């Protein structure tokens, strides 16, 4: 809602060109933003407390079509921290990514950019893995409070796009009871 955007503008995603997204667009939010996650968890918890034991509720859908990453400095820092945890040292990262080959060697974690289209294959793969882990943790943040407050017979899913390769669907689906896919017939994209 507009009040949320106005009160918490930091929860808007930063596009690849560096511009902040505007209110009113689809997927205008930053999945990695702590405030956004806190608010989503609060809504999920309240809904689960209210409807979690309702016999007419058969399941829960966390979200719809993860697809829009944020490219701001906050996400870049989270990515760099993720890389530190994964590789331990820059020497290890540089060796694993073969950065010496094209003079791409990093000497400080802050030098590592966000890149998803061109560049070092190790960087591209690591970004995709980071995005997968980010979506999974965003989802698990809500999944945990739903599970704690709902009937165990209610399934939990999220809706994914089978043709979208911006993340690893298997990683994102690990904590779900089932993975869902939508096919929007009539939109022309399958012609």
What is the predicted role of each segment?
Residues 3:
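Catalytic-site neighborhoods of secreted/periplasmic enzymes
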Residues 190:
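Active-site-adjacent beta->alpha loops and helix N-cap segments on the catalytic face
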Residues 6-178, 182-187:
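Polysaccharide-binding and catalytic clefts of secreted carbohydrate-active enzymes
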